[in-house]
């Protein structure tokens, strides 16, 4: 990988990688750290990463770093209001809906949450997710099925309350 190819990867994937880390950790600083560490590892291993597999490599590294941080209990517990913005007048409050979805996702086990985010937010295939997480493709499908079932249950419980 040349410097120009690396720069192209940074411009192409940094935003998606950042969103993935931010949704998982809910900390701007930690998300930036994850992105920086992921790209650092890509550069350090540039000779071993196959051409065309850079995105998969970056998300695999980010996923593993996120899992490590969650296991160590370093989830963000500060003021989340810094991540919120007010909707423009006359526009629906999509941020409120986004926060609600984030809360629902937070109720899932970390692995299920990460897989849902990789599949539904980032558009990865089951095969790509299996490679990233070192699970079989069948296991990935089962975890996603369980996560979606749990989300339906959670949303159903909310509807009964409302």
What are these regions (language model features)?
Residues 133-157:
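DNA-recognition helix of helix-turn-helix
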Residues 60-80:
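Arg/Lys-rich amphipathic alpha helix in sigma70-family domain 2
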Residues 115-119:
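A short pre-motif secondary-structure segment
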Residues 130:
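The alpha-helix within a helix-turn-helix
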Residues 29, 127, 138:
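Residues within helix-turn-helix
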Residues 72, 81-106:
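Acidic, proline/glycine-rich intrinsically disordered inter-domain spacer in sigma factors
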Residues 1-19, 23, 29-32:
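A short, charge-rich alpha-helical start-of-domain segment used by transcription regulators
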Residues 19, 33-40, 44, 52-64:
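Structural recognition of an alpha-helix C-terminal capping motif at a helix-to-coil junction
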């Amino acid at each position: 990988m040349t410097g120009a190819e690396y720069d192209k990867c940074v411009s192409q994937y940094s935003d998606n990688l950042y969103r993935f880390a931010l949704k998982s950790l809910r900390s701007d600083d930690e998300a930036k750290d994850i992105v920086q560490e992921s790209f650092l590892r890509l550069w350090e291993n540039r000779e071993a990463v196959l051409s065309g597999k850079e995105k998969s490599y970056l998300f695999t590294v980010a996923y593993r770093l996120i899992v490590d941080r969650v296991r160590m209990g370093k989830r963000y517990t500060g003021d989340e209001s810094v991540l919120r913005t007010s909707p423009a007048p006359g526009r629906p409050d999509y941020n409120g809906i986004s926060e609600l979805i984030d809360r629902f996702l937070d109720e899932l086990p970390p692995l299920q949450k990460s897989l849902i985010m990789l599949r539904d937010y980032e558009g990865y295939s089951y095969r790509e997710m299996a490679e990233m997480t070192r699970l079989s493709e069948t296991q990935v499908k089962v975890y996603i099925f369980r996560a979606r079932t749990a989300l339906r249950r959670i949303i159903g419980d909310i509807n009964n309350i409302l």
